[in-house]
Every structure is written in structure tokens, then in C-alpha cells.
Amino acid sequence: MEAAAEPGNLAGVRHIVLVLSGKGGVGKSTISTELALALRHAGKKVGILDVDLCGPSIPRMLRAQGRAVHQGDSGWVPVFVDREQSISLMSVGFLLEQPDEAVVWRGPKKNALIKQFVSDVAWGQLDYLLVDTPPGTSDEHMAVVDALRPHSPLGALVVTTPQAVSVGDVRRELTFCRKVGLRVIGLVENMSGFVCPHCSECTNVFSKGGGEELARHAGVPFLGSVPLDPELTRSLEDGRDFIQDFPDSPAFPALSSIAQKILSETPAGLS
């Protein structure tokens, strides 16, 4: 029988959600960032653990590039990205000398850092910890799941786009979740059509409905479709709070709905 893990620095974290994608370029880190912002505006304290070691993009999305982490009494202190200290972030991007520096590490070194991130970051009290993972399935994913398993993560949020090739990759991601015993909270389809800002007509730039159909066939919840949205892209490039600044944009209701569905999965958060 496996021994229970010491809660350590995750003792104050109520719910852990992994964000996965079958391939790169589907907007996984975008969904992680916007979900964190939406949860924050719902009154929750949120942490983001960016373990996409070779592509740590979240510091830029949250305008936190160049910030430094430091060692506290209980471990690494994450970077707070807002004045209220309601969103904290830990990323390998904070450990690089230059933002565009390549991480050229072999598997064992990556896995060791992932385990250190899980055990040694002093998160304090959080309602949600979102874990932004690399694309695909690899040793790094196994390291993340193994390190978090003793802490009973809520499950995985899987991100795809409508194209058949992306949907095929997500099938493998869902198989991975089943094999490692990781519950799938739901599937999100990103980049699902472009809504004209003038007439509000939606044009399906890629194929249509692949994510929803896959969710139905796989027997997992479909949490929603997020359209292509220039204002969302602009907010990420500028490090702005999309949920606060663009409530009338096409992507806003979709992202808010996904956050509400995550909230409905869990009991009331911290006061």
C-alpha cells in the first residue's frame, strides 16, 4: 500500500487542475491564463505552475517577465502578478537569464525540476492551482502526474482545436489520462471560428465541432468553444487582463462559462 505524502507546500491548496493538450499551438497556455483570470474575478485565489519547460509563455502573458523568485523559509516564493496577490505564478521562465534562452536539458533534469516545483514552491492558501503542462505526452507528464498524485488533483482540462489532426492528438491525451488514472474534468475547443466584429457572423476558419464530437464519443464533458478573438490576442501580447478589459468581446462569454463550470465542480472556495 502506497504511503500518504506529506502535504508540505501544497497543504493550503484546495483544488489542483492540470491543463493538457495533445499538440502544441492549440492555445493551452492561453486557456490556463484566462481561466486563472476568470477564477480571480470570481473571488478565488489562484496559482499557476508553468511546467512547460521548453516554452514558458505565461510570464509574458501576465506581464511578469523579468521578475525574480526568491527563497523563503518554506521554499521558493512565487511571483504575484496583481496588487491584490490573488494570482501567483511559478515558471522556469523566471530562472532563465534571458527570456528567449533555450532550455536544453535531458529528461532526468527536467523531471527533477518538475518534482522540485511541486514540492518546493510556497503557495500558501489557494483555491485553485492550475498546472500548465507541455504539449503531448512524455516523461515530463508522467513526472507531473506522479508528483501530484498524492495530493489528489481534481483532474485534467484538455484543450484542442477543431482540426482533425488536433482532435486525433487529443484522443491520445485522453487515453493517457485513463491509463494514469487522471480524471478528465472536460474538453475545451479553442480557435473555433471567427466572429466578425461588425456583423457578429461566425466563420469557421477551421473545421467545425471536432472537439464537441470527440467529447461525446469519449464520454467526457464538453466545457465550451472559444472563438478566435483579436482582442484576446492583443490582451495576451500586452499583458492585459482580458476578463476585466474586454467584457464585450466574442471570447469573453465562452471563457467565463468554462470558469463557471470548473467552479461548479468544486465546493465553495476560500473566504
Swiss-Prot record:
It comes from Bos taurus. Keywords: 4Fe-4S, Acetylation, ATP-binding, Cell projection, Cilium, Cilium biogenesis/degradation, Cytoplasm, Cytoskeleton, Iron, Iron-sulfur, Metal-binding, Nucleotide-binding, Nucleus. GO terms for biological process: cell projection organization; iron-sulfur cluster assembly. Its main location: nucleus. The lineage of its organism: Eukaryota, Metazoa, Chordata, Craniata, Vertebrata. PANTHER family: CYTOSOLIC FE-S CLUSTER ASSEMBLY FACTOR NUBP2, NUCLEOTIDE-BINDING PROTEIN NBP35 YEAST -RELATED. Transmembrane segments: none annotated. Component of the cytosolic iron-sulfur (Fe/S) protein assembly (CIA) machinery. Required for maturation of extramitochondrial Fe-S proteins. The NUBP1-NUBP2 heterotetramer forms a Fe-S scaffold complex, mediating the de novo assembly of an Fe-S cluster and its transfer to target apoproteins. Negatively regulates cilium formation and structure. Belongs to the Mrp/NBP35 ATP-binding proteins family. NUBP2/CFD1 subfamily. One of its GO terms (molecular function) is ATP-dependent FeS chaperone activity. This is Cytosolic Fe-S cluster assembly factor NUBP2.
